[in-house]
Swiss-Prot record:
Spans annotated as B: 338-554
Listed GO MF terms: ATP binding; ATP hydrolysis activity; ATP-dependent protein folding chaperone; unfolded protein binding
Function, in words: Molecular chaperone. Has ATPase activity.
Keywords: ATP-binding, Chaperone, Cytoplasm, Nucleotide-binding, Stress response
Residue segments, region A: 1-337
Organism the protein comes from: Francisella tularensis subsp. holarctica (strain LVS)
One GO cellular component, as annotated: cytoplasm
Protein name stated in the entry: Chaperone protein HtpG
Database matches in PROSITE patterns: HSP90
Region of interest (C), residue spans: 555-628
Family affiliation: Belongs to the heat shock protein 90 family.
InterPro entries for the chain: HATPase_C_sf (IPR036890), Heat_shock_protein_90_CS (IPR019805), HSP90_C (IPR037196), Hsp90_fam (IPR001404), Hsp90_N (IPR020575), Ribosomal_Su5_D2-typ_SF (IPR020568)
Places the protein is found: Cytoplasm
Subunit structure: Homodimer.
Length: 628
C-alpha cells in the first residue's frame, strides 16, 4: 500500500519545536522515554493476555531490545508488547490527547531553565526522540493482527509524517532513530548501557543489548547474542537495604517523568492478613496542571508484578500528589476497575497507605522543618481538602496544617496549630482565626485591633479553601476554633474591671442611636451594635456564628453558585463608640447627614471586608460628598 502523508496537529508542532530547541541539554531522556513506552506496551499485553492468551502468539519472553548501528547511524528500541494499529499510530504519534496541553504551552515563559522544568513536568514521551534524531521511523504491529497489517510511520519533525501498511513478522513496536551528527557519540555500547542503568535499571521488563567483548588491545566485538543489562527485580520488591538513594530517585523520575528529585519516598512491605508492597513518592514541586480536575492521578496497581492499571481508588483525592506503586498478592489478575471500586482488599490497602503517608509527613514535619516547609508550600492547599473529605483522619491532617499568623510577621505559612496552642495566653481556651482573600487584607483587617492590643495571636487564613475547611474543623486538641469575623467575641476575661464598666456605660448611652441607625439601614443589616473588636477603626461588619463570611459569599456569587438557606445572610454592623466619626453620628441632628454617615460606615466596612458592593458609584459619590 502506498504511503499517506499527514500533518501534525498545531500543538504537536509547537511541542516538537520546544523539544528540539529547549531540551538539547537533557538529551539523555530520549532513551528513558522510549524504554518507558516499550515497558507500558509489554505490561498492557501481559494484562490483556490473561483473558486472551492467543495475543501472545506463542511468545511470552517479554523483552525490550536496544540496538545501534554505527554505519547506518541508528539506534533502535524494540519490544514485543501490545503494538499499535494504523489508527492508533496516527492518534498516538500525530496528536496529543493529553488534557491541559494548550494551558501548558501558554505557561512557557521563554526562560530556558524554567521551561525545561515545565516540559519535564508535562512529559514529552515519544517526541523526545527528536532531541537526538533528525528522522524517526516506527514499525509496529498490534498483537493478534495479521502480519500483513503492520504500520510504518516516518517523520523528520519538519514536514508532518507519513504512514503506510507493511508486513511485520513479529508483534510489537520498533522505533528507529536516525541520529544527528552532533549526537553520534551515543552509538556506543557503554553509553547506551549507562543510560539504561541510570534511568531504567529498575523496571520490571528485561532490557537487552547484544553482548560486547573486548580483546587485549581494547578492540570491541559485538556478538549476535543478547544479554539483559538492567536489574529486572522490581525495585519495590527489593529490601530497603538493597536499594541506593540514586536508584530510588531514578525510579521516581522513570514513573513520574519529572526532572527533579523526589522530596521523599516511603518504601513499605506489609505481611499478615493483608500482603502488599508499596513504594510511594512525594514530589518537590506540583506540576503545572495540578489543579486540572480532568487530570488523571493515582498509583500504579500491580498484582504479583503484573501491571493492572492506574488506580484512583488507591488514594483519597487530597493525596493525589503522591506517585508510586502498589503490588498486591491478594487480588485476582483479571481484576477490573468496576470490581476494584467495591473491593475490600483495595479499601484496606487505601486505608493503610493513607495512614502511612500521614504518619510519614508528621515525622518529616518533626525531623526536618525545612523539607516539610517545601512540601507544604507545594501541596498544602490540596492537603487541606482532607480536613473536610476524610473525617477519620481529620485530627491527623489538622496537625499537619501550617498558617501565617499575626505573630509570624509575613505571609509564609509556617505556624502549626500546636505552635499556636503553645503560645496561647494563660486564660485562653480558644484558637482565633480570620479568613480573607489575601494576606494584606487579613493582616490589616480592623477586626484584629482588639486582639493585637491584648497580645492575642490570630491565625490568618487566605487560601480559597480555608473557609470551607473551617466549617468542618471546629476544634483541635480540645480547643475551640473561633472565627473573629463571625458572631460575638467574648474577650471579657482579658479586660480590666474598669474597661468592662466603661463598655457597659457606652452600650447604654448608644442604645437609642443604634436603633436609629438600624432603622435607616433597614434591610441592609441584620443588626447594629457596639464592637468589642475595634480600637482604631470606626466600623466593621460580621456575620452570625453560622453564617458564611462576606468575602466567601462574594466568591460564590462570582462563581455563579447559590446559597443554602441561611448562609447568604445580611451582615451585622459593629461600631467603635470612641471613634470621632461614630461620636459625630451620635450627636448628629440633621436626618440626611445622619442617614449618609450611617450608610458610609456600613459601606466602608463592607469594602474593607471584601464584600460585594452593589452600587460602587453610589459609594464613591457618598464619600466625595463629605470630603472637605
Amino acid at each position: 500500500m502506498s504511503e499517506k502523508k499527514y500533518t501534525f496537529e498545531t500543538e504537536v508542532d509547537k511541542l516538537l519545536h520546544l523539544v528540539i530547541h529547549s531540551l538539547y541539554s537533557n538529551r539523555e531522556i530520549f532513551l528513558r522515554e522510549l524504554v518507558s513506552n516499550s515497558s507500558d506496551a509489554i505490561e498492557k499485553l501481559r494484562y490483556e493476555s490473561i483473558s486472551n492468551a492467543a495475543l501472545n502468539e506463542d511468545d511470552t519472553d517479554y523483552a525490550i531490545r536496544i540496538d545501534f548501528d554505527k554505519d547506518a547511524k541508528t539506534i533502535t528500541v524494540s519490544d514485543n508488547g501490545i503494538g499499535m494499529t494504523e489508527e492508533e499510530v496516527i492518534e498516538n504519534l500525530g496528536t496529543i490527547a493529553k488534557s491541559g496541553t494548550k494551558k501548558f504551552l501558554e505557561s512557557l515563559t521563554g526562560d530556558k531553565s524554567k521551561d525545561n522544568e515545565l516540559i519535564g513536568q508535562f512529559g514529552v514521551g515519544f517526541y523526545s526522540s527528536f532531541i537526538v534524531a533528525d528522522k524517526v521511523t516506527v514499525r509496529t504491529r498490534k498483537a493478534g493482527q495479521d502480519k500483513s497489517q503492520a504500520t510504518k510511520w516516518v517523520s523528520d519533525a519538519q514536514n508532518g509524517f507519513t504512514v503506510e501498511i507493511i508486513t511485520k513478522e513479529k508483534r510489537g513496536t520498533e522505533v528507529i532513530l536516525h541520529i544527528k551528527k552532533e549526537h553520534l557519540d551515543l552509538l556506543e555500547y557503554h553509553v547506551l548501557k549507562g543510560l539504561v542503568n541510570k534511568y531504567s535499571d529498575c523496571i520490571n521488563t528485561p532490557i537487552q543489548m547484544k553482548k560486547v567483548e573486548y580483546d587485549k588491545d581494547g578492540k570491541q566485538t559485538v556478538k549476535d547474542e543478547y544479554e539483559t543489562v538492567n536489574n529486572t527485580k522490581a525495585i519495590w520488591l527489593r529490601s530497603k537495604g538493597e536499594v541506593t538513594n540514586e536508584e530510588y530517585q531514578e525510579f521516581y523520575k522513570y514513573i513520574s517523568h519529572d526532572f527533579a528529585d523526589a522530596l521523599m519516598w516511603i518504601h513499605n512491605k506489609v505481611e499478615g492478613n493483608l500482603e502488599y508492597n508499596s513504594l510511594l513518592y512525594i514530589p518537590q514541586n506540583k506540576p503545572f496542571d495540578f489543579w486540572n480536575r480532568d487530570k488523571d492521578y493515582g498509583l500504579s496497581l500491580y498484582v504479583r508484578r503484573v501491571f493492572i492499571m492506574e488506580n484512583k481508588e488507591l488514594l483519597p483525592p487530597y493525596l493525589r500528589f503522591v506517585k508510586g506503586v502498589i503490588d498486591s498478592a491478594d487480588l485476582p489478575l483479571n481484576v477490573s476497575r468496576e470490581i476494584l471500586q467495591h473491593n475490600k482488599v483495595i479499601d484496606k490497602i487505601k486505608k493503610a497507605i493513607t495512614t502511612k503517608i500521614l504518619s510519614e509527613l508528621k515525622k518529616l514535619a518533626s525531623k526536618d522543618k525545612e523539607k516539610y516547609q517545601k512540601f507544604w508550600d507545594s501541596f498544602g492547599q490540596v492537603l487541606k481538602e482532607g480536613v473536610s473529605d476524610d473525617y477519620s483522619n481529620k485530627e491527623k491532617i489538622a496537625g499537619l496544617l501550617r498558617f501565617a499568623t499575626t505573630q509570624s510577621g509575613d505571609s509564609k505559612q509556617t505556624v502549626s496549630l500546636a505552635d499556636y496552642i503553645s503560645r496561647m495566653k494563660e486564660s485562653q481556651d480558644t484558637i482565633y482565626y480570620i479568613t480573607s482573600d489575601s494576606y494584606k487584607a487579613a493582616a490589616n483587617n480592623p477586626q484584629l485591633e482588639a486582639f493585637k492590643k491584648k497580645g492575642i495571636e490570630v491565625i490568618l487564613m487566605t487560601d480559597r479553601i480555608d473557609e470551607w475547611m473551617m466549617s468542618t474543623l471546629t476544634e483541635f486538641d480540645d480547643k475551640h476554633m473561633k472565627s473573629i469575623i463571625k458572631g460575638d467575641i467574648d474577650l471579657d476575661k482579658f479586660e480590666t474591671p474598669e474597661n468592662k464598666e466603661k463598655f457597659e456605660k457606652e452600650a447604654k448611652d448608644f442604645e437609642k442611636v443604634l436603633k436609629e441607625i438600624k432603622e435607616v439601614l433597614k434591610d441592609k443589616v441584620e443588626d447594629v451594635r457596639l464592637s468589642k473588636r475595634l480600637t482604631d477603626s470606626p466600623s466593621c461588619v460580621v456575620v452570625n456564628d453560622y453564617g458564611m463570611s462576606l468575602h466567601m459569599q462574594k466568591m460564590m456569587e462570582e462563581a455563579g453558585q447559590s446559597f443554602m438557606p441561611g448562609m447568604g445572610m445580611k451582615p451585622i454592623l459593629e461600631l467603635n463608640a470612641e471613634h470621632n466619626l461614630v461620636q459625630k453620628l451620635k450627636n448628629e441632628a440633621d436626618t440626611e447627614i445622619f442617614a449618609d454617615l450611617s450608610e458610609l460606615l456600613l459601606l466602608q466596612a463592607m469594602f474593607v471586608e471584601g464584600a460585594k458592593i452593589e452600587d460602587p458609584m453610589a459609594f464613591v459619590k457618598l464619600v466625595n460628598k463629605y470630603i472637605r
